[in-house]
Amino acid sequence: MPDNAYQIECVESAPFAENSYILWRDGRSDALVIDPGFDVESIRAILDANRLSTAAILNTHGHSDHIVGNAKMKSAYPTAPLLIGRNDAICLSDPVANLSAAYGIAITSPPADRMLDHGERVELAGFSFEVREIPGHSPGSVVFVFDEFDPPMVLGGDVIFAGSVGRTDLGGSAPQLFEGIRAHLYTLPDATILWPGHGPSTTVGQEKRTNPFVRGR
């Protein structure tokens, strides 16, 4: 039987309404922190309220609103490794690549402790999940597929949203993004829960039926 005894909390941070996630298994004292944004204080408050340490910091991609909290998280939890897709790792140190320079600021992050590749399986904090690379919004965007759950769930960053998809006009590719969504998300069960980098959660089935940018075939 699938083990669904887990908790997930979302912290939405201004100014980009970016979603950070804290994920942990019931009965454990460590958690995964995904895409720490500007509001690290609220992330830490959730960790402290649940008496959790940080097992790892995961970035779905390297855009500044999703990596800006990395430095504060690493300072607070220095033993927690930082993981990001291999093809977005350069964004951590390059304000042009992570788009913060376009806003007149220079956001940088500590370097990755581990770079992730498509198809890799990661085991952390009692979880086992698959990395799937879906470029198009950024060169190395990855999603984390927790296929051990019923229904499965995906932490998807800015690849797909409820009723929309990630921007492709900042050095991305719409055909590449749509192809990746169909190949690596729409092949999952319709009940799969999608936790995006902005906005509310949705499901694979809902997006296949109604997403105006990329319908299921």
What are the residue ranges of the model-derived segments?
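Short Pro/Gly-enriched beta-strand edge/turn motifs at strand-loop
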Residues: 1-7, 100-104, 126-127
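Conserved beta-strand hairpin/beta-sheet module of binuclear metal-dependent hydrolase folds
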Residues: 2-50, 143-157
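Hydrophobic residues at beta-strand termini and immediately following loops
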Residues: 11, 116, 134
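Conserved S/T- and glycine-rich ATP-binding loop of Class I adenylate-forming
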Residues: 23, 60, 134
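Metallo-beta-lactamase
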Residues: 29, 52-54, 96-101, 121, ...
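Active-site HxH/HxHxD metal-binding segment of metal-dependent hydrolases
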Residues: 38-123, 152, 209-216
